[in-house]
Design a protein with these regions (language model features):
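Extended active-site neighborhood of metal-dependent phosphoesterases/phosphodiesterases
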Residues: 51-134, 139-141, 170-178
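N-terminal active-site segment of His-dependent metallophosphoesterases
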Residues: 1-59, 75-76
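Active-site environment of divalent metal-dependent phosphoester hydrolases
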Residues: 13-15, 43-48, 70-78, 115-120, ...
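Active-site neighborhood of phospho(di)ester-bond hydrolases with catalytic His/Asp-centered motifs
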Residues: 7-8, 35-40, 64-70, 112, ...
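Short gly/ser/thr-rich secondary-structure transition/capping motifs
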Residues: 18, 89-93, 165
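Alpha/beta-hydrolase fold active-site loops
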Residues: 2, 106, 143-146
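His/acidic metal-ligating clusters that form di-metal
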Residues: 28-34, 121-183
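Short, flexible segments with low predicted structural confidence
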Residues: 7, 29, 103-104, 147
Length: 183
């Protein structure tokens, strides 16, 4: 059995110590094989927030595969947003914005759905969509195939529909056709 821990939107900078301690205890008890961290790791993409997130991730009992979220890009620091939008993310979390994890039973493909010119409403390029499709098609039949990204493709509440990934209605069927098991 493969055991995954999925964490999204911890928003370091607003984290509560008792919640972080409970998450670490839960992870230690469950002993996941891999942790998936799917964006909004920080509240305002500040170096100190990323340092705290890194310190937390280093305490997890499994490797961490992460993708950035819109809060992981500078919002008010326009120079940083334009010229080095992923600088703190790369310095503290991962140099890779679209990581891939593969084992004999698992393939996890990370996709960066953020755009420096936009604070919300994630988007994927045709190149990104095709890259994921190609990797999914190349997976072995006995591998669980997972795609991770920050922006949602479904909304339960009508008010959340404004936050959906742009063009999700055409992206998801392509990935399903390519063999995706979980998004």
């Amino acid at each position: 059995m493969i055991r995954l821990l999925h964490l999204s939107d911890p928003h370091f900078g607003t984290e509560q110590p008792e919640v972080m301690a409970a998450l670490l205890a839960f992870a230690a008890e469950r002993r996941p094989d891999l942790t998936l961290l799917t964006g909004d790791i920080t509240q305002r993409a500040r170096a100190e927030q990323f340092r705290r997130a890194r310190a937390f991730a280093d305490q997890l009992p499994a490797p961490v595969l992460s993708v950035p979220g819109n809060h992981d890009l500078p919002l008010f620091n326009l120079v940083g947003r334009l010229f080095n939008p992923y600088g703190h993310y790369r310095n503290h979390i991962s140099n890779e914005l679209e990581p891939v994890y593969e084992s004999s039973r698992l393939l996890v493909i990370g996709v960066n759905s953020t755009r420096p010119q936009r604070h919300k409403n994630g988007e994927l390029s045709e190149r990104q969509i095709e890259r994921v499709s190609r990797l999914l098609r190349s997976a072995r039949s006995d591998q669980l195939r997972i795609v991770i990204q920050h922006h949602p493709v479904r909304a339960i509440e009508a008010s959340d529909k404004a936050n959906l990934l742009i063009n999700h209605e055409r992206i998801v069927p392509r990935w399903i056709d390519a063999g995706m098991d979980l998004l």
